[in-house]
Amino acid sequence: MNAVLALNTATHPDFQGQGLFTKLASMAFAGAADAGYDYAYGVPNAQATPGLTGRQGFRLVCSLDADICLLPYRRPNPTADGEPVAAFQRIWSVDALQWRLSDPNARWRTKLRDPNTLQVWGPGPAPFVPTYEEIFLNADLRPLDGLFAPPGPMAFTPKLHLGKRPPGGVTPNVSIQIPDRLRPSPLNFVVKNLHGETPEIAAQEVIFTALDFDAY
């Protein structure tokens, strides 16, 4: 399944009230469908969510979690071959992951946690609080091993987990959940089928990470 990210957009004040946002969004989704994409997903805030779930036919799946964690993620079974497959999950290829981590405007730092797990740090809400994520290096990604710093001591430093993971799987470790009232803009995760009715996707069936969109 191929999916495309629906970027957050706005209409210039001089051109508001003419239906341009809805028209251009519909044209963009039609173009994505013609290009072979099956789904579109987005990460709107509370104000933008009704426009996507109403006029544009997106389904609201869940709110994204936001946690400040101090240690690498907790893994219930460290010897398992990666995470369980979810209903919605990004499957990285070598080229796609290299491209994502090489963004010149928001470059991610990387280090191997162990031979199977890549740690990544990216732009966050403050210079001393980076966004943090971990990627399981399956057989398809093993050619990238030599590009990353080797495993080292665990850093007891604050980092932001922003996304959604199934309960009982890989989860933030020694973490504090940020209440909605303290977030500048709480984010939701929405999905749209570009070729028909959007099926219901349960929040516990989603693996969605900060690498799947640009929060900062």
Please describe what each predicted stretch is.
Residues 4, 9, 119:
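Conserved GNAT-family N-acetyltransferase fold
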